[in-house]
Regions:
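Short, solvent-exposed amphipathic alpha-helical segments in soluble enzyme
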Residues: 20-24, 98-102, 123-124
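S-adenosyl-L-methionine/SAH cofactor-binding core of RNA-modifying enzymes
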Residues: 61-112, 117-118
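Hydrophobic/aromatic beta-strand patches that form the interior of the parallel beta-sheet core
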Residues: 4-6, 34-36, 81-83, 106-107, ...
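Structured adenosyl-cofactor binding patch, chiefly the S-adenosyl-L-methionine
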Residues: 116, 120-126
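N-terminal nucleotide/polyanion-binding subdomain common to many enzyme families
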Residues: 1-74
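Generic recognition of short, well-ordered alpha-helical segments
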Residues: 16-20, 95, 119
Length: 126
């Protein structure tokens, strides 16, 4: 099983993954977990991954472009089951865990700020 995690804080994710049950599972070759920095796919020189929401509103929203490019790199252009981790979504439970366990590869998208660009959610999230 391969789990890719799209995040702005890969070092934090990797630290937890090395020191947990998942770390032992990785050592045994049961699962491969990789955290990828979304900023690495920003096209500007400052690696900007956020901006004010289109149409106004408060806060910052993660930009669609670096999200798309990161997702494309991780999925290799193939459909890979993608989950956006958000407080607005359905609660994670044992049934959802079993569904993910059946996947050979899936991508977890960690949001930040006020959220992420809805266009990315509509296009890439299952």
């Amino acid at each position: 099983m391969k789990i890719d995690i799209m995040t702005l804080f890969p070092e934090m994710i990797n630290a937890v993954m090395r020191e947990s049950i998942i770390g032992r599972a990785q050592d045994k070759g049961i699962v491969e977990v990789k955290a990828t920095n979304i900023r690495d796919y920003a096209l500007d020189k400052h690696h900007k991954a956020d901006d004010a929401p289109y149409g106004g509103g408060r806060g910052q929203v993660m930009l669609a472009e670096p999200l798309y490019l990161c997702h494309e790199a991780l999925s290799g252009g193939e459909h890979v089951h993608t989950v956006f981790l958000s407080a607005q979504g359905a609660p994670f439970n044992q049934e959802k865990a079993r569904e993910l366990l059946a996947k050979e590869h899936f991508i977890l998208v960690c949001g930040h700020y006020e959220g992420i660009d809805q266009r990315f959610i509509d296009e890439c999230v299952d």
